[in-house]
Amino acid sequence: MQAEPKKSQAEQRAVAEPVSEPVSLVGEEYEVEVGPVAHGGHCIARTSEGQVLFVRHTLPGERVVARVTEGEEGARFLRADAVEILDPSKDRIEAPCPFAGPGRCGGCDWQHAKPGAQRRLKGEVVAEQLQRLAGLTPEEAGWDGTVMPAEGDKLPAGQVPSWRTRVQFAVDADGRAGLRRHRSHEIEPIDHCMIAAEGVSELGIERRDWPGMATVEAIAATGSQDRQVILTPRPGARLPIVELDRPVSVMRVGEKDGGVHRVHGRPFVRERADDRTYRVGSGGFWQVHPKAADTLVTAVMQGLLPRKGDMALDLYCGVGLFAGALADRVGDQGAVLGIESGKRAVEDARHNLAAFDRVRIEQGKVESVLPRTGIDEVDLIVLDPPRAGAGRKTVQHLSTLGARRIAYVACDPAALARDLGYFQDGGYRVRTLRVFDLFPMTAHVECVAILEPAAKGL
């Protein structure tokens, strides 16, 4: 019988001395001076021991009592809520929403800040990400630092724009609809969401019981009266009879396949943008703010300045919003190729743009499909990637196609900044950057960066 190897002294100590569990700091309170805003809807502070705190429900320059919500001794950082404001900022207001605040609804980040201050804070986040990840100052990115509100959203302090045309309500064990608390599966029951668009509020989702449902998503299309509800049942649950305050089509998420299936009514809604109607299938992507699609199309087309006869790419094209705008502008002698990974979105894009012989829509991942097309030269590129961004490999490929201008649409300034750095490595420079507040009361923004070959800017 072979003898076991002798344990080292360190191994013997590890057996003799069981490893202690990290000590949770949840619930601990610290009086702190609040520093700058950070990406994600919180501000940075430090404990007296120097540990970093990411604090929600506060503003830069305030002195607050911060209660830890996540983290342990020795962790790189802690998460916390400001539960007492000792020295308030001049930008602080009382949150208009009765469901906002520490431990409450997680749908909004800046209910406690004046609207102008919200936009200023978002601008500071974008500027910090540009500098840190792309090495660009606002001036070098062609941006004046302004975060522009959507048309109609510039309201006095205390008033909240009702902008969210898609709201997914979570349902608790008692069948009550609400919204999830921040970074939690716990549900805050509500009777009204202030940022929900009028068409969503009119349905009365929050005023009904939803037994057996996990989520209820409400959609109110822009430019049509289409209303839709998507139900996600809990395992084994039966669908309730849907009786709402307005006519709706009803879909359900399949328990086995996760697909969205028709119960009754149209399996899509009709959205309107750039003087065109777009069919968007159940579960498909469309901008949530009613002014967002037109705002972004205008910004992209003003930046690209398409010409008759141009060859253009629309990458991550969804249901064809930018491809349609490009097709109108490049004319019969031009061509547009859209690439989208979602099967249903591709079907919708082909339907929406069927009148254009010059538009082709391909299904698949951009990094896989684009090399297979054999395209080695284009005039214009639009890319509107998911939150994670396009990534180094895709940006490197796009940088070889000789595009006269590139429009990058992004909902995450960190991913945008990383990819702008890759474009710079590939010989492009940022000509202009525009930042839009299309998600009021939240930490999110939408950016449109226009790039051109660096040699052109010399």
From Swiss-Prot:
Pfam families linked to this entry: TRAM, tRNA_U5-meth_tr
Record-stated family: Belongs to the class I-like SAM-binding methyltransferase superfamily. RNA M5U methyltransferase family.
Residues of the TRAM domain: 23-84
Ranges where the record places region Disordered: 1-20
Source species: Streptomyces coelicolor (strain ATCC BAA-471 / A3(2) / M145)
Phylogenetic classification of the source organism: Bacteria, Bacillati, Actinomycetota, Actinomycetes, Kitasatosporales
Keyword flag Transferase: yes
One Gene Ontology term of the molecular function aspect: 4 iron, 4 sulfur cluster binding
Gene Ontology annotations of biological process type: rRNA base methylation
Biased composition (Basic and acidic residues): 1-10
PANTHER family: RNA M5U METHYLTRANSFERASE, TRNA (URACIL(54)-C(5))-METHYLTRANSFERASE
EC number: 2.1.1.-
Protein name: Uncharacterized RNA methyltransferase SCO5901
Catalytic residues (positions): 411
Amino-acid positions noted as binding [4Fe-4S] cluster in the UniProt annotation, renumbered to this chain: 97, 105, 108, 193
Keywords associated with the record: 4Fe-4S, Iron, Iron-sulfur, Metal-binding, Methyltransferase, S-adenosyl-L-methionine, Transferase
Binding site for S-adenosyl-L-methionine: 287, 316, 340, 384
Top-level taxon of the source organism: Bacteria
